[in-house]
Amino acid sequence: MSWRSEYIWVEFIAGSRKPGNFFWAFILFLGSLGFLVVGISSYLDRNLLSLFPSQQINFFPQGIVMSFYGIAGLFISSYLWCTIIWNVGSGYDRFDTKEGIVCIFRWGFPGKNRRIFLRFLMKDIQSIRIEVKEGIYARRVLYIESRGLGAIPLNRTDENLTPREIEQKAAELAYFLRVPIEGF
């Protein structure tokens, strides 16, 4: 999603709150909870989960391994839920031609660098760069080449833009900023 006027262009960046992340965090939570309950059931020798009779799963070694997988899955699931709650990776890119300033903001993990904020002058922008890697894991990333800061990515690497979409986005941004386009 973006917003544009004559002098200002704001590009909003989606973070971790995507349907796929919700789906995998939920599935991982349920699966790891199931493993943990089966492991505890085998230890107590009681049916806490009525799908499997506890006598069929020995605590050593199957119950211990299932408990370990359940605990590990709960840790990974809690990590995914934290990234969703904190909305890691979301933010905006603001290009202001009237003031000649570019602001790039992203939310990170809690701590000293929770707010990632880059602010630099438009005259420091050398070009817009498109990096395309084809293959099984194809990725197309749009960068701003800047003096002093190097290449700054503008879109997420997991954003699956078609070649036409990435070229159009690069052309519009290059025209708005009045800089050349480089391709890789």
Swiss-Prot record:
Listed GO CC annotations: chloroplast thylakoid membrane; photosystem I
GO terms for biological process, alphabetical: photosynthesis
Keywords linked to the UniProt accession: Chloroplast, Membrane, Photosynthesis, Plastid, Thylakoid, Transmembrane, Transmembrane helix
Main subcellular location: plastid
Transmembrane segments: 20-40, 64-84
Role according to the record: Seems to be required for the assembly of the photosystem I complex.
Protein's name in the database: Photosystem I assembly protein Ycf4
Gene from which the chain derives: ycf4
